[in-house]
């Protein structure tokens, strides 16, 4: 018999069913979503993940991400919240900030950090909002040359990124012959453009950045220097690549690439004395902290994702261990081994090699392109992504493949294993060229994919390579939650 609650009948059976729904495991509650997750888990387990921006988070990070912290709203900052019941959230966020500064060896008197950005793109936009007035000028590495979409990318016909819509953007470039950043040309253009902010950051650039040179250019133009170290943040922790903190005013990062945490972002900013007035001797302080914090909240975000902040805190603790530092050294060693093996197989690597976790393979000499190779390799259980190479005429048919080693290094692959991976890639690209020869030089990507999917001869070759790849990948355990 139903009882009345606030004048409305309550169905006891229905309410009991509601309580059961809240307690059901995902497998029973939503079989469709569970099945999709299981399929994706299997894809990751049997495939070779070579996308440079991906990694496998640890079990501890994923447990924090799936915790009760997801339930709590906490707009504001520690000690200054707009909600009650946030004492433990304050404790967590303060711990995450402390670990972030410790991980990168930063003095809390000289640096602060905001750990609330939802990811790297919001972190970057918050910095622009804080430091550059609307339609103010910024300079970042051009997307086709290895930069990132959020660094102000636009084409001749359209402003693509919101950064280029709300701010005036001028890209700097690499030398098309060497693939290295053309710092001389950047310096000349900065004198003409007078940027308020220069961005030192990349998404597909295999060499270390010259932060000292970039800071000199920034100082000559009265500009801030911001590093976007999203791709290399784990390498920076381990000290295997140069740190941006010595020269930059602001440093942003994601937390899920080489840092191997969950998906989130951080903004580091200088605090304390910026300069001393030569006439009065008065100290001039940085005001970045208040500007950046207010840009993140309430400027661009609402309540922080506390479960993600917990995952970041866990990842930062792991990043300060000797094991993590050894892992990062192996990431770089594996990347160099992969590069050397591909060169031996006759491939051109943009810049001739790598200082970090990724390489860009130029396929023009092989007579094919990144889009077609990506599709064939994907069919063979090898995940990577197409990418423009210096000198490409069109972003619609990029010549390169971006390959990274962080994810497979997390699974335990070493240099000798990456030599085998290089041979798998080589066989996939040879198959790409064969399919392209069958479709003709004027065939579209759509026609190429139809040939790949519909031709039994090519499908047999794909199946044979995929079976070898999956048998090899299954030898290496997949980090993360058991069952997924």
Curated annotation (Swiss-Prot):
Question: What is one GO cellular-component annotation here?
Answer: cytosol
- Mark the residues carrying the PTM N-acetylalanine: 2
Q: Does the keyword Cytoplasm apply?
A: yes
PTM section of the record: Deamidation of asparagine produces alternatively aspartate or isoaspartate, which in turn can be converted to aspartate through carboxylmethylation/demethylation.
What domain of life does the UniProt record list for this protein's source? Eukaryota
Recorded hits in Pfam families, A to Z, give: SHMT
Q: In which pathway does it act?
A: One-carbon metabolism; tetrahydrofolate interconversion
Task: Using the UniProt record, give the first listed, main subcellular location.
Answer: cytoplasm
Cofactor(s), names only, from the UniProt record: pyridoxal 5'-phosphate
Q: Catalytic site residues?
A: 204, 256
Binding partners and assembly: Homotetramer. Identified in complex with ABRAXAS2 and the other subunits of the BRISC complex, at least composed of ABRAXAS2, BRCC3/BRCC36, BABAM2 and BABAM1/NBA1.
Q: What else is known?
A: In eukaryotes there are two forms of the enzymes: a cytosolic one and a mitochondrial one.
**What function does this protein fulfil?**
Interconversion of serine and glycine.
Which protein are we looking at?
A: Serine hydroxymethyltransferase, cytosolic
Q: Which organism is it from?
A: Oryctolagus cuniculus (Rabbit)
The beginning of the lineage is: Eukaryota, Metazoa, Chordata, Craniata, Vertebrata
Q: Which gene encodes it?
A: SHMT1
């Amino acid at each position: 018999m139903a009882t009345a609650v606030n004048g409305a009948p309550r169905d006891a059976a229905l309410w009991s069913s509601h309580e059961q729904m809240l307690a059901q495991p995902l497998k029973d509650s939503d079989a469709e979503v569970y099945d999709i997750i299981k399929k994706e888990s299997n894809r990751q387990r049997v495939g070779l993940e070579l996308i440079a921006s991906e990694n496998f988070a640890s079990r501890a990070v994923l447990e924090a991400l799936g915790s009760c912290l997801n339930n709590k709203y906490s707009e504001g900052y520690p000690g200054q919240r707009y909600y009650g019941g946030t004492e433990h959230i304050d404790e967590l966020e303060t711990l995450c900030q402390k670990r972030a500064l410790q991980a990168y060896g930063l003095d809390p008197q000289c640096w602060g950090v905001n750990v609330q950005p939802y990811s790297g793109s919001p972190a970057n936009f918050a910095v622009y909002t804080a430091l550059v007035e609307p339609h103010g000028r910024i300079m970042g590495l051009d997307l086709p040359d290895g930069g990132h979409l959020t660094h102000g990318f636009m084409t001749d016909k359209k402003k693509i990124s919101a950064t280029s819509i709300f701010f005036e953007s001028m890209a700097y470039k690499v030398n098309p012959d060497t693939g290295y950043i053309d710092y001389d040309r950047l310096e000349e253009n900065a004198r003409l453009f007078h940027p308020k902010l220069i961005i030192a950051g990349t998404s597909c650039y295999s060499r270390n950045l010259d932060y000292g040179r970039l800071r000199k250019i920034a100082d000559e133009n009265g500009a801030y220097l911001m590093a976007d170290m999203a791709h290399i943040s784990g390498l920076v922790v381990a000290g295997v690549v140069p740190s941006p903190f010595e020269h930059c005013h602001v440093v942003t990062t994601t937390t899920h690439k080489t840092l191997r945490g969950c998906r989130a972002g951080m903004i580091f900013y200088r605090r304390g004395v910026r300069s001393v007035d030569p006439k009065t001797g008065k100290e001039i302080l940085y005001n970045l902290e208040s500007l950046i914090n207010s840009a993140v909240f309430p400027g661009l975000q609402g309540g922080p994702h506390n479960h993600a902040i917990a995952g970041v805190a866990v990842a930062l603790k792991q990043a300060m261990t000797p094991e993590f530092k050894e892992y990062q050294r192996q990431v770089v060693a594996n990347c160099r081994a992969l590069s050397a093996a591909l060169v031996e197989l006759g491939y051109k690597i943009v810049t001739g090699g790598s200082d970090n976790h990724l390489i860009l393979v130029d396929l023009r000499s092989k007579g094919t392109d990144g889009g077609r190779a990506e599709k064939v390799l994907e069919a063979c259980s090898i995940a990577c992504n197409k990418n423009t190479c210096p000198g490409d005429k069109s972003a619609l048919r990029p010549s390169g493949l971006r390959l990274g080693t962080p994810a497979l290094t997390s699974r335990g692959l070493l240099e000798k294993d990456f030599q085998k991976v290089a041979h798998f890639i080589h066989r996939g690209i040879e198959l790409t060229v064969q399919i392209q020869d069958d479709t003709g030089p004027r065939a579209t990507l759509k026609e190429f994919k139809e040939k790949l999917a519909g031709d039994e001869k090519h499908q047999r070759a794909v199946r044979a390579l995929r079976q070898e790849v999956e048998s090899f990948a299954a030898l290496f355990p997949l980090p993360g939650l058991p069952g997924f």
